[in-house]
Amino acid sequence: MSQTSLHHARLDWNEAGTPVSSDFGDVYFSNDNGLSETRYVFLQQNGLPARFSHHNSDSFVIGETGFGTGLNFLATMKAFLEQAPQTGNGARLHFISFEKFPLTRDDLHKALTAWPELAPFSQALIAQWPLPVPGCHRLHFAGGRIRLDLWLGDIKEMLPQVPHGEQGLVDTWYLDGFAPAKNPEMWTQDLFDGLARLARPGATLSTFTSAGFVRRGLIAAGFAMKKVKGHGSKWAMLAGERVDKKPQRTIVPWYARPAGRDGEVVIIGGGIASAMTALSLVERGRKVTLLCEDHELATGASGNRQGALYPLLNGEHDALSRFYSLAFGYARQRLLSLAKHHPIAFDLCGVVQLGYDDKSTAKLAKMQQGPFPHALMRPLTPVEAEHECGLPSGHAGVSYPLGGWLCPADLTRAAIKEAQASGLLQVEYDCPVTAIHEQVDGWLVASREGRQWQAPNLVVAAGHQLPALSPFAELPLYPVRGQVSHVPTTATLSQLKTVLCYDGYLTPAHNAEHCIGASYGRNQSTQAFSAEEQAQNQARLQACLPDQAWPAEVDVSSNEARVGVRCASRDHLPVAGPIARLAGLADHYARLQRDQQNPAPLPLHPGLYVLGALGSRGLCSAPLCGELIASEICGDPLPLATDLLEALHPARYWIRKLLKGKPLN
């Protein structure tokens, strides 16, 4: 996928107050009541909102080719909430849209003031409006009943990356955008073919244009199209539906992510990963039982007082960087939403990362070559770094202005309380799981005390204890011990305004104490206090800032600290998804290196999922990974591009070897 930076739309405003694209010379919506045109062209011609009432699956999926001001989405959301059934688990709306030139937040606000009847929905959109970072940004509305996947970037690149199975994904297409004469690069046969590929059998489509080449192109792609009366004074427009659906998919069989079984889900875990997964599942109406090993939540790696929240980026903007740039935005969204109703200690005060030696300086310099807006990451001179964080370092660095710190345990508890409010989540404490057993129609989970639970679906989010449970022992994961020191603030240390990252990190004061850490003990899982690591936490700060006096005020002598054990992977990415049957996998894919045309699907343990290896970035990655697992189980659209799904797939370690013709060992 392209690493090109995104640019905000450049707007003019005409006499009617309508936004006009400076680059394309076209209006974003009709001067003559654009909302009325939206309702006629896209809702009425697609049989909406009536189809919402009798849709035969939990989630109705709409795709749109040009998000613009979001008018189509907002009008659809209003109609859905007015029409869709409220009984049972409730129908859900999933809206997928693409935008190459997103509006600024201020321009979006100005444009949407034209529609006061949509104000509550507009405000929710503006509050979550993402940064111009390429990829899929998932936003939640109406308590999770409505999800918007906003794919920022060129639709020619993004559309082939939308994951879907053989029978498509989309129930209705809104073919919108600037007029074909104004933006001919978008209106191509490749686009029409892509819409057909993602369309489910019988999916409908409508568009404001009646251009002959558009009609012919859609027919060639597999739609039955007709001209109908246009809106208002417009003579005609196009409407139709998908016919002659041929099985096509974007997820290759060896990275399969089939939907889970209907019914309940059991989750093993008690930290941020399991909490976020549970929340995303109950938002979809699933009953969940969470099995927590301890007598309370977040006693493991999720139990630190303060954890830094910022993205892991690099100049190549590879899969790692792309995933974390999107996960960061989603984590912020989840945090701010939960903090409205639950007590969470946090401060999005920013994060400053220093180039403290030649290697780290070169790494930051290369990172600045990536396609990142300054609102996500911007370079700092030594003077700017001091001004930003409040204390001198003598080093240049970068700022993550939207980052900060939060209490992981508070976030974990908030997610669980929010999920419990639905009445669909039951938490069982003091349940150390010792074995899981596959059954014909689900999974049996057994605890040390002999208690048992059964469910069609099982998610294991047990942190560094994952390898202790079969069939997870073969995953190439490892434990990482980390000790965080708690130090009292001083008059000088209290001037620290942001999280400061170097060869370690130091948080601003909270309750008159700072957190400094953390030690890194690979393949170590002991949790006893270490005086040596306590001293090392302070020594690393002094070593990185040798010319500064204030690090000497960091006093670790009280031996106040907390030890946690994280679970990590070799490639620093989480494992999130279904679990493959390793026995016979090499024989199953013996010819995969040479023949990738008709391979059999990946042999999986049905209904079994894993979420782990979050490492030291769990605050950033857990919310999006939990949403991914829930989407997968429920058969919903997935919130990441296909190549990122491959990068997170638990089977990636073995599939990569098989694709290279290497033996599995």
UniProtKB/Swiss-Prot annotation:
Location(s) in or outside the cell: Cytoplasm
Region (FAD-dependent cmnm(5)s(2)U34 oxidoreductase): 268-665
Cofactor names: FAD
Keywords: Cytoplasm, FAD, Flavoprotein, Methyltransferase, Multifunctional enzyme, Oxidoreductase, S-adenosyl-L-methionine, Transferase, tRNA processing
Protein EC: 2.1.1.61, 1.5.-.-
GO biological-process terms attached to the record: methylation; tRNA wobble uridine modification
Entry's Gene Ontology cellular component terms: cytoplasm
GO molecular function, one term: flavin adenine dinucleotide binding
Main location: cytoplasm
InterPro entries attached to this UniProt entry: FAD-dep_OxRdtase, FAD/NAD-bd_sf, MnmC-like_methylTransf, SAM-dependent_MTases_sf, tRNA_MAMT_biosynth_bifunc_MnmC, tRNA_MNMC2, tRNA_S-uridine_synth_MnmC_C
NCBIfam families reported for this sequence: MnmC_Cterm (TIGR03197), PRK01747.1-2 (NF002481), PRK01747.1-5 (NF002484), tRNA_MNMC2 (NF033855)
HAMAP family: MnmC
Family affiliation: In the N-terminal section; belongs to the methyltransferase superfamily. tRNA (mnm(5)s(2)U34)-methyltransferase family. In the C-terminal section; belongs to the DAO family.
The protein's role, per its UniProt record: Catalyzes the last two steps in the biosynthesis of 5-methylaminomethyl-2-thiouridine (mnm(5)s(2)U) at the wobble position (U34) in tRNA. Catalyzes the FAD-dependent demodification of cmnm(5)s(2)U34 to nm(5)s(2)U34, followed by the transfer of a methyl group from S-adenosyl-L-methionine to nm(5)s(2)U34, to form mnm(5)s(2)U34.
Official protein name in the record: tRNA 5-methylaminomethyl-2-thiouridine biosynthesis bifunctional protein MnmC
Record lineage: Bacteria, Pseudomonadati, Pseudomonadota, Gammaproteobacteria, Aeromonadales
